[in-house]
Amino acid sequence: MIPMQHGLILAAILFTLGLTGLLIRRNLIFMLISLEVMINSAALAWVVAGSHWGHPDGQIFYLLAITLAAAEASIGLALLLQLYRRHHTLNIDILSEMRG
């Protein structure tokens, strides 16, 4: 069995990588992938904690995280398609420009 500290350290590293990718990248596809990594790292922390204490709650929260990630991906991809159709780019900075 993997010690709890190792699983939580791995989850923290993955969350940090996802947060870094979310803050640094300006492409919407990379931002969605980074957000998925962050959601999965939080779910990993729940599973590790649940397996350490012998409760199935971590696995239940993992199922919740999977459904949340699926909803986030579908909404994000719909926004991505609309952004590309209107502006012919996937750069998120285009959305912050004001029309005048």
UniProtKB/Swiss-Prot annotation:
Enzyme Commission code(s) on record: 7.1.1.-
Primary subcellular site in the record, as a coarse category: membrane
Compartment(s) where it occurs, according to its Swiss-Prot or TrEMBL record: Cell membrane
Domain of life (superkingdom): Bacteria
Enzyme class at the top of the EC tree: translocase
Catalytic activity reported: a quinone + NADH + 5 H(+)(in) = a quinol + NAD(+) + 4 H(+)(out)
Any single Gene Ontology cellular-component annotation: NADH dehydrogenase complex
Record-annotated membrane-spanning stretches: 4-24, 28-48, 60-80
Keywords of the record: Cell membrane, Membrane, NAD, Quinone, Translocase, Transmembrane, Transmembrane helix, Transport, Ubiquinone
Topology in the lipid bilayer: Multi-pass membrane protein
A GO term for molecular function: NADH:ubiquinone reductase (non-electrogenic) activity
Pfam families linked to this entry: Oxidored_q2 (PF00420)
GO biological process: ATP synthesis coupled electron transport
Role description: NDH-1 shuttles electrons from NADH, via FMN and iron-sulfur (Fe-S) centers, to quinones in the respiratory chain. The immediate electron acceptor for the enzyme in this species is believed to be ubiquinone. Couples the redox reaction to proton translocation (for every two electrons transferred, four hydrogen ions are translocated across the cytoplasmic membrane), and thus conserves the redox energy in a proton gradient.
HAMAP family listed in its UniProt record: NDH1_NuoK
Entry similarity comment: Belongs to the complex I subunit 4L family.
Known partners and oligomeric status: NDH-1 is composed of 13 different subunits. Subunits NuoA, H, J, K, L, M, N constitute the membrane sector of the complex.
Protein name: NADH-quinone oxidoreductase subunit K
Source species: Hamiltonella defensa subsp. Acyrthosiphon pisum (strain 5AT)
Organism placement in taxonomy: Bacteria, Pseudomonadati, Pseudomonadota, Gammaproteobacteria, Enterobacterales
